[in-house]
Structure formats: structure tokens, C-alpha cells
Amino acid sequence: TKFASNLHEPLGMFWKDGSLFATQRPEHTRLTDKDGDGRADSFDTICSKWGISGDYHEYAFGSDPDKNGDVWMVLCLTGSFHAHAPWRGWAAKITPEGKFIPVASGIRSPGGIGANDRGDFFYTDNQGVWNGSSSLKWLRAGSFQGNPTGNKSAALANFPTPPEPTSGSRTLAERLKFPEYVPPALILPHGKVGNSPSGVACDMSKGKFGPWESHMLIGEQTASQVQRVNLEVVNGLYQGAVFHFLGGFEAGLIPVRMDQEDGTLFIGGSNRGWGSRGSKNFTFERVRFKGKV
């Protein structure tokens, strides 16, 4: 049943207090059915503090609310080399009242965002400038994620401007120069574990999805797969390992969500604008644990 239409590429949705909340390209929106006919008739802008320039690449990915009710979001750069609008290449929180709070800089091309069982937020960043291979990154508050393109918004955030990383340098050397730099929790070998990671989910179903409690699940658009990630904290930073997990989906995977009540994994797919192993234009698929590994 259609609830709403004409949204601008929403890449993050959740229900709360009888309304549907959507992170769209230009704004975070509350959609409400006030007359009870099953269709949204009230569209309220909660926050629209970031900028867009019209470039196709300027996606906005939003999370479910955290324990404080804040929505975390990551904002793509303008293409691969520019930040033509405010807050491009940044992560931020949106409070229930609509306040925009910058959280981290240094982002390139996110494909999804989600929290682990500790409530820490992670996003997938795609291979390209300053990202030798795609990765899963921890959004520690106040951190720099490695790509300096969006540094021009640091003054707006009252953040220290990170120095330009040295091409060909090493993570340890760059962290000594700028301790706010947080290296990837996990690097995804390009071509071996896909080329374009997307949605992020965490298995907190207490065994309903199998023996992978607290593991992260990330989508892969090019290869039409789901990868499984096991993380640990060492010396205050996340690190971990990635495993091929599920394949054979019918389009490129974008959102990945788990129903923690019954352990069903829901996956949305599309090959619009980016080729994928799955050949369908749009899909909605689900995965349930059969009881065997």
C-alpha cells in the first residue's frame, strides 16, 4: 500500500510515534497520516541544515534513532573531488527537535550507516580518493575519517581543521600528526569482498538469525551480496574480520535491515546508476535462518 510519494531519494526510514521519518537528499522529514486514510498528508521538515548543489552524488544516509532519539547521518561529497555545498563529507546528528550537530569529518562516499550492539555507529565508505579500498568505519564523535575534501566546513563546526594526509603514508604516522584520525575498523579488499559496500545492520536477534549475535551485516551493491563482520575493540579502536556470507540477490544491495523480534533480514536492491551482478532494476528480498549453518 502506497503511504507517500515524490520523496527525494530517501536513504533511511523508521516509524516512531505513529509517523514515518525519512532522511531524504535535502532534508530529514516526518510523514504523518492525520486523517486516517492510510496515506501521508502531513510532511514536516525536521532538519535541512546541510546543502545540495544538484550533483547526483550528494546522497544523505540516515540511521534509526539512537538511545537519545538522535538520528545519525552521513553526507556524500560532491562527486569524488569536491564539496560544493556545506557539510559535504561530514557526519552529523539530528536531534528530535531538529538541531543539526556535526559529529565527524573526512567522509568520502558512504553507502549506509548503522549501529552495533554497543550503540556505536558505523558507516561504509566506498573506494576512491583517499580510500584505497572500501571500508567499514567507526563514527567516533569528533573524529576525522581520512578524506580532507570536506574540511572547508570545519570552521562551521568549530572543529580543528585536519591537516592534509600525506599520500603514501601509513596510518600510524598520520595518527601521530592528528590523533583525531580514526582508521577504518575494517578494510574490504577491493574485488575480493566486493566493490561498493552499502547498508549496515547488526544481528541482535538473540539467536533467531543463527549463531551470529552481535555480528555486523553489510550489503554489497556491485556483487549483490551480504558480508558478515565480527568486530572487537583493541586499545580504544575497533578492528575485525569480514566473511563472505550471503549471495545470489537479484539486484545491487542498498538498505539492509534486521527485524530483531523474529530475526528476518530485509534487503532492498537496485541497479540504477551502478551495475550489479543481480540484473533486476528494483527488488525487496528477505532472508530467514533455517536452523542449519
Residue ranges and their predicted role:
Residues 1-293:
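Beta-propeller domains with acidic blade repeats across secreted/periplasmic ectodomains
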